[in-house]
Amino acid sequence: MKFTKMHGLGNSYIYVDCFKELLKEEELPALAVAVADKNKGIGSDGMILICPSDRAPVKMRVFNNDGSEAKNCGNGLRCVAKFAFEHGYVKETSFDVETLGGLVKATVHPNDNGLVDTVTVNMGEPRLGRAQIPMLGEEAAEVVAEPFTIGEKEYRLTAVSMGNPHAIMFIDTIEDAPVEQVGPLLEKHEAFPDWVNVEFVQVVSPTEIHFRVWERGSGITQACGTGACAAVVASVLNGFTQKGQEVTVHLLGGDLTISWLENGDVLMTGAAETICEGTYVKGLSY
């Protein structure tokens, strides 16, 4: 199986070109776990398939390093857009990508050599009702700074879906974020039927925030694009910034520029990089 390893701000995945590779559906979860293993596999946060689509030039399927399939991945979207453009699957610089969470619009920014350094993705409108997250409780109600007890401590949660669920908590100092302690407890909390990505945010100013994440199905990662989008939406909902404002989000792996537009869409701009290409031969039944 030919693969390309790529990363967006250190959030790395093994990318498989399914225009050329034929994989068995029933083996995909186990394959994702195997290739993501840093000791016995290639090493990554998961596996992303770049597939043909009836609705768009390309389709993205995301598998976490535990084998579960995710609806969306912001960092993955940027890398898929870069791959699709550089490999000639699209000619335009703006095009749709199909995800399990719906269609998203990607715009690549090629350099003079025709290679893509950065990508802007229109992540669409955030979903804020409990039923859309999903989160148990009154279906239509928004969850903004809602008291929520985790362990023996009370936090204030803001819940946002960017095609996948996020629970955001604001803290005074990002270095004190209890990611390893609170992340796994909240990730699989019964209040979130589909589990949830857990984010901690420190607001520096209306144009700058710090961000840490415990990703659903992956644990601590260097970056989470949809999480950064959700964090900016949550910052607006809590009055720390405003719609239409570009916000720099500092993640462990680097920076993203996010804005929640007046029309409701969320734009994300950031880097996408290719690390290496190779052939994976272990454990395949074909």
UniProtKB/Swiss-Prot annotation:
The record marks 166, 215 as: Could be important to modulate the pK values of the two catalytic cysteine residues. It is an enzyme of class 5 (isomerase). InterPro entries: DAP_epimerase_AS (IPR018510), DAP_epimerase_DapF (IPR001653). Pathway: Amino-acid biosynthesis; L-lysine biosynthesis via DAP pathway; DL-2,6-diaminopimelate from LL-2,6-diaminopimelate: step 1/1. Its EC number is 5.1.1.7. It comes from the Bacteria. Gene3D superfamilies: Diaminopimelate Epimerase, Chain A, domain 1. Substrate binds at residues 11, 64, 74-75, 164, 197, 215-216, 225-226. The keyword Iron does not apply. One of its GO terms (cellular component) is cytosol. The keyword Ubl conjugation does not apply. It is found in: Cytoplasm. One of its GO terms (molecular function) is diaminopimelate epimerase activity. The active site is at 73 (proton donor), 224 (proton acceptor). It catalyses: (2S,6S)-2,6-diaminopimelate = meso-2,6-diaminopimelate. Pfam families: DAP_epimerase. One of its GO terms (biological process) is lysine biosynthetic process via diaminopimelate. Keywords: Amino-acid biosynthesis, Cytoplasm, Isomerase, Lysine biosynthesis. Belongs to the diaminopimelate epimerase family. PANTHER family: DIAMINOPIMELATE EPIMERASE, DIAMINOPIMELATE EPIMERASE, CHLOROPLASTIC. Homodimer. Catalyzes the stereoinversion of LL-2,6-diaminopimelate (L,L-DAP) to meso-diaminopimelate (meso-DAP), a precursor of L-lysine and an essential component of the bacterial peptidoglycan. NCBIfam families: DapF. This is Diaminopimelate epimerase. It comes from Halalkalibacterium halodurans (strain ATCC BAA-125 / DSM 18197 / FERM 7344 / JCM 9153 / C-125). The gene is dapF.
